[in-house]
Amino acid sequence: MTAKLEKVLIANRGEIALRILRACKEMGIKTVAVYSKADKELMHLGLADESVCIGPASAAQSYLHIPAIIAAAEVTGATAIHPGYGFLAENADFAEQVENSGFAFIGPKAETIRLMGDKVSAKHAMIEAGVPTVPGSDGPLPEDEETALRIGREVGYPVIIKAAGGGGGRGMRVVHKEEDLIASAKLTRSEAGAAFGNPMVYLEKFLTNPRHVEVQVLSDGQGQAIHLGDRDCSLQRRHQKVLEEAPAPGIDEKARQEVLARCVKACIDIGYRGAGTFEFLYENGRFYFIEMNTRVQVEHPVSEMVTGIDIVKEMLSIAAGNKLSFTQDDVVIRGHSLECRINAEDPKTFMPSPGTVKHFHAPGGNGVRVDSHLYSGYAVPPNYDSLIGKLITYGTTRDEAMARMRNALDEIVVDGIKTNIPLHRDLVRDEGFCKGGVNIHYLEHKLAGEKH
């Protein structure tokens, strides 16, 4: 590795911090772990070369506190910073400050994060690159009522109004009939201004029963980009993914190959650097771009399992200034992989369930991978996201991956706190999901049906 990547500070916690640390160690890169006062017991702290406390339990004063993270990098002589996912991973100001302070940011350039973070400019960039997008206002929804109503008519109801600065399911409102459009637009504008500091909204056609299919890409920022196939993340609750798989089952092959090629072209067009994900809605054999995630994703392991490519190591290599070490022809999608997100939460009410893990036993066997920072005696703090691990299986077929996941879910033991493992045990035996190709409303409808 070049001097650029001699020592990496991992600006995150939990399972992803451990995941990044493992990749660094494999590549002979020194590591710096940072942690809040609530996270003194994190597993990766003992494995890192150095660890630095960056503040109190509150994320705003620790994992989101840019000066503390940059100071930790300076004190330890780190040469690069990996943001992981969540926290500051898609914060363009952070990426900029990291680079301006003389460190390498393991991710895209700040201007790329800005471009893709604003949903309106992102959509423009995708239209220019030939990536299929959802029909809509193709820019901010005009405040002029007549023009707005005309756009609504052209797109056809139902439509969805979205905040340009929103994301993760926040800042959106569905409008079913024309007479509600203007009031809904005003309401979303004022909410967006308050929540995101940006009142701009745009309008899109609302797809009623789509699937969520995304494309994983790697791009070296030096003119070369490749895709690692697609993933299906349609099993969601409140816009949060619960279970993911690769490749997406039952997709029209011609549409798939076309969208994969367009995503690669888009990376080259925008000068993308690092790992990224293009998220699409897929309905009636067509793809519609929704957003691009400019970071490593929670569900990256399923793509690793079916391609044999280590996404985090590639991110590190690209950040060191290397070109991609392989071409698209070298990428072969083999078999099938599933991932269950294990959360510390009540499986019925979904309320967080922090506390001490009395006993943890990880499942094993052929084609089983566990990405988790849990250990017996570890106390899950109440301050952060409830994700405590990911259970990943691989099989030569989807059925085999599913059978292995059933076994793994039956074997795993997490005592002392409540988890959503019972929900996953149910899902991998659910007839609709086992058939493949369920839409993004499937899980919520299933859960609602069980309540009544």
Residues of each region from the PLM?
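N-terminal beta-alpha lobe that positions the nucleotide/phosphoryl donor
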Residues: 1-278, 282-293, 297
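Catalytic cores of soluble metabolic enzymes centered on carboxylation/carboxyl-transfer
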Residues: 301-452
